[in-house]
Amino acid sequence: MASLINQAAWQPKARTRSLQVGPGPTPSPNEHEIVIKVAYAAVNPTDWKMQDTPYFELEYPFIWGTDVAGTIVQLGSEVTQFKVGQRVIGHCDSLLTRKVTNAGFQLYTTVREILVAEIPDSLPLANAAVLPLSVSTAASALYVQLDLPFPSLSPKSTGKRIVIWGGSSSVGSSAIQLAVASGLEVVATASQANHDLVRSLGASQVFDHRAPSVIDQMASVLQPGDYVVDCIGSPDTQAKCGELVGRIGGGTLPVMLWPQGGLPQNVRAVFVNGLDPGMVNLDVGNAVWRKFIPEALAAGKFQAKPDPRIVPGGLEKVQEGIDMLRQGVSAQKIVIEISRSE
């Protein structure tokens, strides 16, 4: 096929808050990659954190972006599960590969097949764009770090409860739904305004994370062997989740921030790598991305939450979206309209 004419929002150098829109890399998928024309791309905390204080060295100019929704335009030679024209979501992993072709903030991105999922026609692309990184991160916490049963449309009860701290967050929204689909009863935290949202995702009990007695309240409904996941990733939430795990006998605590220390001796905090399902634990990627997510979305048993806060205007608006998230949002995800596809 003819070469695709690409455009991208480039980070010209480290530690600058000014993306530059210009010609993007020409997609050339390997045998297991898929080229997606991006309709919408979501903004994640990683984008502004990498812009302000990179976790590691990169060669610049670079392109950010991990969450995309759009239409397949090209397939690698060994890709058999998908076809050109399908509506899909994709988890872009340029921070792993260090290749700008694998980034999300561009008109055409190249994504590994294991991190692509078909979406039903009933799900708007803008809503679908909130899912990729949150699904991968939640899956890593639940199935890599905690070794829970893989999700199913007809789960069997495990008799266990799991605390999802930050239930209305992007990762928390996916974690609640995956945990329920794995046969666990979910206990979550959220601000009072978001309790109904969190219950609609499947949480049986919701506690106000601001309540002074929240640890006591939650510990009273848990037993040794139950689980806790910190989906917020701040020093404060890590400390509170660590205290809660310690109160119920100890165990593994998946966290979204590097372990800070100072936790009870019976608590082992482990950092959750959202790239894991497509990088190391491919059985998790296959179980979640290839099997469960497409089936659950089609059956109406998985919601694309939180709702998107759409920023129209194309690639020129990516920096604006990053700045908006840097200032903070609640129960929403910033989604940039990259191109008009529906």
From Swiss-Prot:
UniProt: substrate binding residues: 133-140
Keywords: NADP, Nucleotide-binding, Oxidoreductase
Assigned EC number: 1.-.-.-
Alphabetical list of Pfam families matching this protein: ADH_N, ADH_zinc_N
Domain of life: Eukaryota
SUPFAM superfamilies from the UniProt entry: GroES-like, NAD(P)-binding Rossmann-fold domains
Transmembrane segments: none
Enzyme class, UniProt record, top EC level: oxidoreductase
Gene Ontology MF term list: nucleotide binding; oxidoreductase activity, acting on NAD(P)H
Binding positions (NADP(+)): 46-49, 168-171, 191-194, 255-256, 329-330
Pathway per the UniProt entry: Secondary metabolite biosynthesis
Similarity annotation: Belongs to the zinc-containing alcohol dehydrogenase family.
Function: Trans-enoyl reductase; part of the him gene cluster that mediates the biosynthesis of himeic acid A, a ubiquitin-activating enzyme (E1) inhibitor. First, himA, together with the trans-enoyl reductase himH, catalyzes the formation of apolyketide chain, which is then condensed with leucine by the NRPS activity of himA. Dieckmann cyclization and release from himA gives a tetramic acid intermediate as the product of himA PKS-NRPS. HimG then catalyzes alpha-oxidation of the tetramic acid ring, with a subsequent rearrangement to yield apyrone intermediate.
Entry-linked PANTHER family: HYPOTHETICAL OXIDOREDUCTASE (EUROFUNG), ZINC-TYPE ALCOHOL DEHYDROGENASE-LIKE PROTEIN C2E1P3.01
Quaternary state and interactors: Monomer.
Protein name stated in the entry: Trans-enoyl reductase himH
Organism: Aspergillus japonicus
